[in-house]
Amino acid sequence: MLGGSDLGNALAARPAEMVSVSPERWDLLDELHRGGLFRQEFLAAWQNGAAFLAARDGLRRRRPLVVEWRGGQRQPGDEPVPADLRIDHVFLVSCKYLSKIVSNSAPAAVFDRLLAGGHGGRAGDWYAHVAPDAYQALYRTVLDQLRSVPDGAETSAPTFGLGDSIDDATAGAADRVEAAGVAVGDLPASVHELSAADRALLKRRLGRGRWPLPLRRAADEFSLAVADSTAARWRRALATADQERVLWRLLRIGSAPYFVLGASDRGPMRLRIGTAWDWRQHFRIDRFAVTAAVRAQPVIEWRVVISNRRSADTTVVSGHVEVRWSHGKFAQPPEAKVYLDTPHHLIPGYWPLI
Protein backbone atom coordinates (compact mmCIF):
# COMPACT_ATOMS: atom_id res chain seq x y z
CA MET A 1 0.00 0.00 0.00
CA LEU A 2 2.98 2.29 0.62
CA GLY A 3 4.86 1.11 -2.44
CA GLY A 4 8.21 -0.66 -2.55
CA SER A 5 9.11 -4.03 -3.96
CA ASP A 6 10.28 -5.97 -0.91
CA LEU A 7 8.28 -6.81 2.21
CA GLY A 8 11.35 -7.24 4.41
CA ASN A 9 12.69 -3.81 3.51
CA ALA A 10 9.27 -2.25 4.09
CA LEU A 11 9.11 -3.72 7.60
CA ALA A 12 12.66 -2.62 8.36
CA ALA A 13 11.88 0.94 7.24
CA ARG A 14 8.98 1.27 9.69
CA PRO A 15 7.32 3.93 7.52
CA ALA A 16 6.23 7.06 9.33
CA GLU A 17 2.92 7.01 7.47
CA MET A 18 1.82 4.15 9.75
CA VAL A 19 1.08 6.60 12.53
CA SER A 20 -0.66 4.29 15.00
CA VAL A 21 1.81 1.38 15.06
CA SER A 22 3.90 1.41 18.22
CA PRO A 23 7.60 0.41 18.32
CA GLU A 24 6.59 -2.67 20.29
CA ARG A 25 4.14 -3.69 17.56
CA TRP A 26 6.84 -3.18 14.89
CA ASP A 27 9.17 -5.40 16.94
CA LEU A 28 6.51 -8.10 17.07
CA LEU A 29 5.90 -7.88 13.32
CA ASP A 30 9.63 -8.18 12.64
CA GLU A 31 9.87 -11.24 14.89
CA LEU A 32 6.87 -12.94 13.29
CA HIS A 33 8.15 -12.22 9.79
CA ARG A 34 11.61 -13.62 10.55
CA GLY A 35 10.09 -16.71 12.14
CA GLY A 36 8.46 -17.75 8.87
CA LEU A 37 5.40 -19.40 10.42
CA PHE A 38 3.10 -16.70 9.04
CA ARG A 39 4.83 -16.31 5.69
CA GLN A 40 1.61 -16.80 3.71
CA GLU A 41 -0.30 -14.28 5.82
CA PHE A 42 2.41 -11.64 5.39
CA LEU A 43 2.54 -12.27 1.64
CA ALA A 44 -1.26 -12.07 1.26
CA ALA A 45 -1.41 -8.79 3.19
CA TRP A 46 1.47 -7.36 1.15
CA GLN A 47 -0.19 -8.31 -2.14
CA ASN A 48 -3.55 -6.90 -1.03
CA GLY A 49 -1.90 -3.61 -0.10
CA ALA A 50 -0.20 -3.44 -3.48
CA ALA A 51 -3.51 -4.15 -5.22
CA PHE A 52 -5.25 -1.37 -3.29
CA LEU A 53 -2.45 1.07 -4.13
CA ALA A 54 -2.89 0.33 -7.85
CA ALA A 55 -6.69 0.02 -7.95
CA ARG A 56 -8.84 2.58 -9.75
CA ASP A 57 -11.36 2.27 -6.91
CA GLY A 58 -8.55 2.69 -4.41
CA LEU A 59 -5.42 4.86 -4.26
CA ARG A 60 -4.73 4.97 -8.03
CA ARG A 61 -0.97 4.66 -7.42
CA ARG A 62 -0.91 7.64 -5.06
CA ARG A 63 1.17 6.85 -1.98
CA PRO A 64 -0.92 7.60 1.12
CA LEU A 65 0.17 10.20 3.66
CA VAL A 66 -1.48 8.68 6.74
CA VAL A 67 -2.41 5.07 7.52
CA GLU A 68 -4.13 4.48 10.85
CA TRP A 69 -4.65 1.04 12.37
CA ARG A 70 -7.98 0.80 14.21
CA GLY A 71 -8.27 -2.97 14.55
CA GLY A 72 -8.99 -4.52 17.92
CA GLN A 73 -10.79 -1.43 19.21
CA ARG A 74 -14.51 -1.20 19.83
CA GLN A 75 -15.70 1.68 17.71
CA PRO A 76 -17.83 4.30 19.47
CA GLY A 77 -21.27 5.18 18.18
CA ASP A 78 -23.68 3.37 15.91
CA GLU A 79 -21.16 2.39 13.24
CA PRO A 80 -21.77 -0.61 10.97
CA VAL A 81 -18.41 -0.28 9.18
CA PRO A 82 -15.94 -2.84 10.60
CA ALA A 83 -12.91 -0.75 9.61
CA ASP A 84 -9.43 -1.90 10.67
CA LEU A 85 -7.56 0.71 8.62
CA ARG A 86 -8.25 4.34 7.80
CA ILE A 87 -6.17 5.80 4.98
CA ASP A 88 -5.73 9.54 4.49
CA HIS A 89 -8.75 10.10 6.76
CA VAL A 90 -11.03 8.89 3.95
CA PHE A 91 -10.57 5.27 2.85
CA LEU A 92 -11.90 2.67 5.31
CA VAL A 93 -10.57 -0.89 5.00
CA SER A 94 -11.71 -4.05 6.75
CA CYS A 95 -9.06 -6.78 6.93
CA LYS A 96 -10.72 -10.20 6.75
CA TYR A 97 -8.57 -13.29 6.49
CA LEU A 98 -10.23 -16.72 6.40
CA SER A 99 -13.18 -15.57 8.51
CA LYS A 100 -16.90 -15.86 7.88
CA ILE A 101 -17.90 -14.11 11.10
CA VAL A 102 -19.85 -10.91 10.48
CA SER A 103 -20.35 -9.85 14.08
CA ASN A 104 -20.19 -11.02 17.67
CA SER A 105 -22.97 -9.45 19.70
CA ALA A 106 -25.38 -9.92 22.55
CA PRO A 107 -28.23 -12.22 21.49
CA ALA A 108 -30.78 -9.53 22.37
CA ALA A 109 -28.97 -7.12 20.04
CA VAL A 110 -29.42 -9.54 17.14
CA PHE A 111 -32.84 -11.07 17.75
CA ASP A 112 -34.74 -8.33 19.61
CA ARG A 113 -33.12 -5.07 18.53
CA LEU A 114 -32.20 -6.42 15.06
CA LEU A 115 -28.73 -4.86 15.43
CA ALA A 116 -30.20 -1.35 15.55
CA GLY A 117 -28.04 0.95 17.63
CA GLY A 118 -24.83 -0.98 16.95
CA HIS A 119 -23.73 -4.54 17.54
CA GLY A 120 -23.23 -4.09 21.28
CA GLY A 121 -21.64 -6.25 23.94
CA ARG A 122 -22.99 -9.24 25.83
CA ALA A 123 -25.44 -8.79 28.69
CA GLY A 124 -27.82 -11.10 30.54
CA ASP A 125 -28.32 -14.84 30.18
CA TRP A 126 -30.20 -15.41 26.94
CA TYR A 127 -30.76 -19.08 27.71
CA ALA A 128 -32.63 -18.16 30.89
CA HIS A 129 -34.87 -15.81 28.91
CA VAL A 130 -35.83 -18.01 25.96
CA ALA A 131 -35.66 -21.60 27.26
CA PRO A 132 -35.59 -21.58 31.08
CA ASP A 133 -37.02 -25.08 31.50
CA ALA A 134 -34.64 -26.69 29.00
CA TYR A 135 -31.75 -24.76 30.57
CA GLN A 136 -32.62 -26.07 34.03
CA ALA A 137 -33.09 -29.61 32.69
CA LEU A 138 -29.65 -29.56 31.10
CA TYR A 139 -28.09 -28.22 34.28
CA ARG A 140 -29.85 -30.89 36.36
CA THR A 141 -28.49 -33.62 34.08
CA VAL A 142 -25.00 -32.09 34.26
CA LEU A 143 -25.14 -32.06 38.07
CA ASP A 144 -26.17 -35.72 38.18
CA GLN A 145 -23.35 -36.66 35.82
CA LEU A 146 -20.69 -34.68 37.69
CA ARG A 147 -21.71 -36.19 41.02
CA SER A 148 -21.10 -39.64 39.53
CA VAL A 149 -17.52 -38.71 38.57
CA PRO A 150 -14.70 -38.04 41.11
CA ASP A 151 -13.95 -34.35 41.67
CA GLY A 152 -10.42 -34.65 40.28
CA ALA A 153 -11.53 -36.12 36.95
CA GLU A 154 -12.40 -34.27 33.78
CA THR A 155 -15.53 -35.36 31.94
CA SER A 156 -14.51 -34.66 28.34
CA ALA A 157 -11.41 -34.68 26.20
CA PRO A 158 -9.57 -31.34 25.83
CA THR A 159 -10.48 -30.63 22.22
CA PHE A 160 -11.89 -27.36 20.97
CA GLY A 161 -15.57 -27.14 20.19
CA LEU A 162 -18.89 -26.08 21.64
CA GLY A 163 -18.79 -22.80 23.45
CA ASP A 164 -15.02 -22.43 23.30
CA SER A 165 -12.40 -20.46 21.45
CA ILE A 166 -8.66 -20.86 21.14
CA ASP A 167 -8.27 -18.25 23.89
CA ASP A 168 -9.58 -20.82 26.36
CA ALA A 169 -6.40 -22.85 25.95
CA THR A 170 -4.59 -20.28 28.11
CA ALA A 171 -7.40 -19.70 30.58
CA GLY A 172 -7.19 -22.94 32.55
CA ALA A 173 -5.03 -21.64 35.38
CA ALA A 174 -7.30 -18.65 35.98
CA ASP A 175 -10.35 -20.92 36.03
CA ARG A 176 -8.75 -23.21 38.60
CA VAL A 177 -7.99 -20.25 40.83
CA GLU A 178 -11.52 -18.87 40.53
CA ALA A 179 -13.08 -22.27 41.20
CA ALA A 180 -10.84 -22.97 44.20
CA GLY A 181 -12.85 -23.90 47.26
CA VAL A 182 -15.94 -24.85 45.24
CA ALA A 183 -16.93 -28.51 44.94
CA VAL A 184 -19.65 -30.13 42.89
CA GLY A 185 -21.62 -30.72 46.07
CA ASP A 186 -21.66 -26.96 46.68
CA LEU A 187 -23.35 -26.13 43.39
CA PRO A 188 -26.87 -24.67 43.71
CA ALA A 189 -29.97 -26.59 42.66
CA SER A 190 -30.99 -23.86 40.20
CA VAL A 191 -28.96 -22.83 37.17
CA HIS A 192 -30.13 -19.27 37.78
CA GLU A 193 -28.24 -19.13 41.08
CA LEU A 194 -24.78 -19.98 39.71
CA SER A 195 -21.97 -17.70 40.89
CA ALA A 196 -18.84 -16.85 38.92
CA ALA A 197 -16.90 -19.46 40.91
CA ASP A 198 -19.61 -22.07 40.23
CA ARG A 199 -19.42 -21.36 36.52
CA ALA A 200 -15.63 -21.63 36.54
CA LEU A 201 -15.94 -25.05 38.17
CA LEU A 202 -18.46 -26.23 35.57
CA LYS A 203 -16.28 -25.01 32.74
CA ARG A 204 -13.25 -26.84 34.12
CA ARG A 205 -15.07 -30.09 34.85
CA LEU A 206 -16.94 -30.21 31.54
CA GLY A 207 -13.83 -29.37 29.54
CA ARG A 208 -13.52 -28.19 25.97
CA GLY A 209 -14.95 -29.84 22.91
CA ARG A 210 -17.99 -32.05 22.56
CA TRP A 211 -20.26 -32.84 25.44
CA PRO A 212 -19.51 -36.11 27.28
CA LEU A 213 -21.53 -38.96 25.80
CA PRO A 214 -23.97 -39.26 28.74
CA LEU A 215 -24.87 -35.56 28.37
CA ARG A 216 -25.29 -35.34 24.60
CA ARG A 217 -28.99 -36.13 24.45
CA ALA A 218 -29.79 -33.49 27.07
CA ALA A 219 -27.49 -31.02 25.30
CA ASP A 220 -29.19 -31.66 21.95
CA GLU A 221 -32.65 -31.14 23.47
CA PHE A 222 -31.46 -27.94 25.11
CA SER A 223 -29.91 -26.65 21.86
CA LEU A 224 -33.09 -27.31 19.88
CA ALA A 225 -35.27 -25.62 22.52
CA VAL A 226 -33.07 -22.51 22.49
CA ALA A 227 -32.92 -22.45 18.68
CA ASP A 228 -36.70 -22.89 18.30
CA SER A 229 -37.55 -20.17 20.81
CA THR A 230 -34.91 -17.79 19.46
CA ALA A 231 -36.01 -18.28 15.84
CA ALA A 232 -39.63 -17.58 16.79
CA ARG A 233 -38.56 -14.46 18.65
CA TRP A 234 -36.50 -13.27 15.67
CA ARG A 235 -39.39 -13.88 13.27
CA ARG A 236 -41.73 -11.83 15.46
CA ALA A 237 -39.29 -8.93 15.49
CA LEU A 238 -38.75 -9.14 11.72
CA ALA A 239 -42.49 -9.16 11.00
CA THR A 240 -42.84 -5.49 11.96
CA ALA A 241 -39.35 -4.33 10.98
CA ASP A 242 -37.82 -2.81 7.87
CA GLN A 243 -36.22 -6.04 6.65
CA GLU A 244 -34.05 -4.22 4.15
CA ARG A 245 -32.34 -2.33 6.97
CA VAL A 246 -31.93 -5.53 8.99
CA LEU A 247 -30.17 -7.16 6.04
CA TRP A 248 -27.90 -4.13 5.66
CA ARG A 249 -26.87 -4.49 9.30
CA LEU A 250 -26.22 -8.21 8.88
CA LEU A 251 -24.07 -7.51 5.81
CA ARG A 252 -22.37 -4.48 7.43
CA ILE A 253 -23.67 -2.10 4.76
CA GLY A 254 -24.13 1.49 5.91
CA SER A 255 -23.96 5.11 4.85
CA ALA A 256 -20.22 5.05 4.12
CA PRO A 257 -18.49 2.89 1.49
CA TYR A 258 -15.50 0.81 2.52
CA PHE A 259 -13.23 -1.94 1.26
CA VAL A 260 -12.53 -5.52 2.32
CA LEU A 261 -8.99 -6.79 1.82
CA GLY A 262 -8.25 -10.33 2.90
CA ALA A 263 -8.37 -13.95 1.86
CA SER A 264 -10.90 -16.75 1.70
CA ASP A 265 -10.43 -20.45 1.02
CA ARG A 266 -10.83 -19.50 -2.65
CA GLY A 267 -7.91 -17.07 -2.70
CA PRO A 268 -7.46 -13.29 -2.32
CA MET A 269 -10.51 -11.25 -1.34
CA ARG A 270 -10.57 -7.64 -2.58
CA LEU A 271 -13.98 -6.00 -2.48
CA ARG A 272 -15.64 -2.61 -2.48
CA ILE A 273 -18.68 -2.49 -0.20
CA GLY A 274 -21.32 -0.08 -1.43
CA THR A 275 -23.58 2.09 0.68
CA ALA A 276 -27.22 1.49 1.56
CA TRP A 277 -28.11 3.98 -1.18
CA ASP A 278 -26.07 1.98 -3.72
CA TRP A 279 -27.72 -1.25 -2.62
CA ARG A 280 -31.23 0.12 -3.00
CA GLN A 281 -30.50 1.34 -6.54
CA HIS A 282 -29.62 -2.19 -7.62
CA PHE A 283 -31.47 -4.69 -5.42
CA ARG A 284 -34.61 -5.47 -3.45
CA ILE A 285 -35.58 -8.15 -0.94
CA ASP A 286 -38.13 -10.76 -2.01
CA ARG A 287 -38.09 -12.98 1.08
CA PHE A 288 -36.39 -13.10 4.49
CA ALA A 289 -36.63 -16.52 6.19
CA VAL A 290 -35.42 -17.66 9.60
CA THR A 291 -35.31 -21.31 10.78
CA ALA A 292 -33.98 -23.22 13.75
CA ALA A 293 -31.30 -25.78 12.92
CA VAL A 294 -30.54 -29.08 14.62
CA ARG A 295 -26.90 -28.78 15.63
CA ALA A 296 -24.70 -29.55 18.64
CA GLN A 297 -25.33 -25.99 19.80
CA PRO A 298 -28.21 -23.53 19.30
CA VAL A 299 -28.10 -22.34 15.68
CA ILE A 300 -30.55 -20.16 13.79
CA GLU A 301 -30.22 -20.08 10.01
CA TRP A 302 -31.21 -17.05 7.94
CA ARG A 303 -31.85 -16.92 4.21
CA VAL A 304 -32.68 -13.88 2.08
CA VAL A 305 -33.84 -13.97 -1.55
CA ILE A 306 -32.71 -10.82 -3.39
CA SER A 307 -33.75 -9.60 -6.84
CA ASN A 308 -31.70 -7.40 -9.12
CA ARG A 309 -33.74 -4.34 -10.09
CA ARG A 310 -31.95 -4.10 -13.44
CA SER A 311 -32.31 -7.69 -14.58
CA ALA A 312 -34.30 -10.84 -13.92
CA ASP A 313 -31.53 -12.29 -11.76
CA THR A 314 -32.11 -13.42 -8.18
CA THR A 315 -29.54 -14.25 -5.53
CA VAL A 316 -29.88 -16.15 -2.27
CA VAL A 317 -27.77 -14.89 0.62
CA SER A 318 -27.58 -17.24 3.58
CA GLY A 319 -25.94 -17.32 6.96
CA HIS A 320 -26.43 -18.55 10.48
CA VAL A 321 -26.17 -17.36 14.05
CA GLU A 322 -24.58 -19.49 16.77
CA VAL A 323 -25.84 -18.75 20.27
CA ARG A 324 -23.09 -20.14 22.46
CA TRP A 325 -21.52 -19.66 25.84
CA SER A 326 -18.63 -17.23 25.86
CA HIS A 327 -15.33 -18.91 26.84
CA GLY A 328 -16.67 -22.35 27.66
CA LYS A 329 -19.73 -24.28 28.82
CA PHE A 330 -21.63 -22.33 31.50
CA ALA A 331 -18.63 -19.96 31.84
CA GLN A 332 -20.22 -16.64 30.84
CA PRO A 333 -23.51 -15.40 29.36
CA PRO A 334 -24.11 -16.50 25.76
CA GLU A 335 -22.99 -14.52 22.75
CA ALA A 336 -24.46 -14.48 19.25
CA LYS A 337 -21.93 -15.08 16.48
CA VAL A 338 -23.33 -14.08 13.10
CA TYR A 339 -21.82 -15.99 10.16
CA LEU A 340 -22.09 -15.36 6.45
CA ASP A 341 -22.31 -18.69 4.61
CA THR A 342 -22.58 -17.26 1.10
CA PRO A 343 -19.11 -16.44 -0.30
CA HIS A 344 -18.37 -12.73 0.02
CA HIS A 345 -17.82 -12.19 -3.69
CA LEU A 346 -21.39 -13.37 -4.41
CA ILE A 347 -23.10 -10.94 -2.01
CA PRO A 348 -25.22 -8.25 -3.68
CA GLY A 349 -23.64 -4.90 -2.88
CA TYR A 350 -20.14 -6.36 -2.55
CA TRP A 351 -18.32 -5.40 -5.76
CA PRO A 352 -14.84 -6.56 -6.87
CA LEU A 353 -12.05 -4.03 -6.42
CA ILE A 354 -10.96 -2.70 -9.82
Description of each model-found segment:
Residues 1-83, 87-354:
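Short, positively charged
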